[in-house]
Amino acid sequence: EISCSLVGSEMCIRDRFEFIPWILGTCANLEEAKTALIHMNLTNTPYSEQFPLAQLHWIIADQSGAITVEAMEDGMHIYENNVGVLTNNPPFNIQMFLLNQYMNLSPKQPENLFAKDIDLDQYSRGMGAIGLPGDLSSSSRFAKVAFTKLHSVSGDSENESVNQFFHILGSVDQQRGCCDVNGKYEITLYTSCCNTQKGIYYYTTYDNHQISAVDMTKEDLNTKNLICYEVITGEHIQMQN
């Protein structure tokens, strides 16, 4: 059982692998999480000897905003996250600093600011974002998904919003074979989002792009049992003839 009493200035000590279950089981919203984190410290206890400690990055969000929490060698760091995205290293404050490189990018077509005496043409759509990185490094994926998210336009319905979410994260998908690390390939195993008001969890997997969903309100949320669903794998193709 994961529990912690926050009384006065008493510190709450948690193992890193308990952090997310503790936050979700203790805090109802982002403001409560911020308050709880003031009194919190994370230990260096590994989850298993097979999984050594690493620098960890978490994003905690609700409709009011988001924060980033990072467990680093020099302790725990908490940042306001105004872009609402997160990737791995470098640390979040460096990721945000690197966005300065892209302040000239725009979803609109560019003006000729190179030289007024040279006739330059807009030979393609999307030239306002030339320079937006497309490689698979964490810092490049951070910049690209931040740009995509902050400029994306969604419809009003839930289905349209869910659809747009998967398009946003699809902009930084990792395809098998494009990131080779000693003969092993980094891929996007799954993509997911949640309607926190309705309790509906949506996901896709690398091998199944059809959006699957679990409605958590259809389960007994007060049970002490762990409820599991088999991940739907294998591409589901809708034949039209």
Residue ranges and their predicted role:
Residues E1-I13:
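Single conserved hydrophobic/aromatic residue that forms the stacking wall/gate
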Residues S3, T68, T191-C193:
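Short, surface-exposed charged micro-motifs
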Residues E10-I23, S140-H151:
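N-terminal short leaders/motifs
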Residues D15-R16, N41, P52, K184:
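Short, glycine/acidic-rich beta->alpha junctions
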Residues R16-T45, E158-F165:
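Proteins synthesized as precursors that undergo proteolytic processing into mature forms
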Residues H39-M76:
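Catalytic cofactor-binding cores of redox enzymes
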Residues T45-Y47, L53-A54, D62-Q63, V85-N241:
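C-terminus-biased signal that marks the final domain/tail of proteins
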Residues T68-A71, H77-N81, N88-N89, Y203:
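Short helix/loop capping segments that flank catalytic or ligand/cofactor-binding pockets
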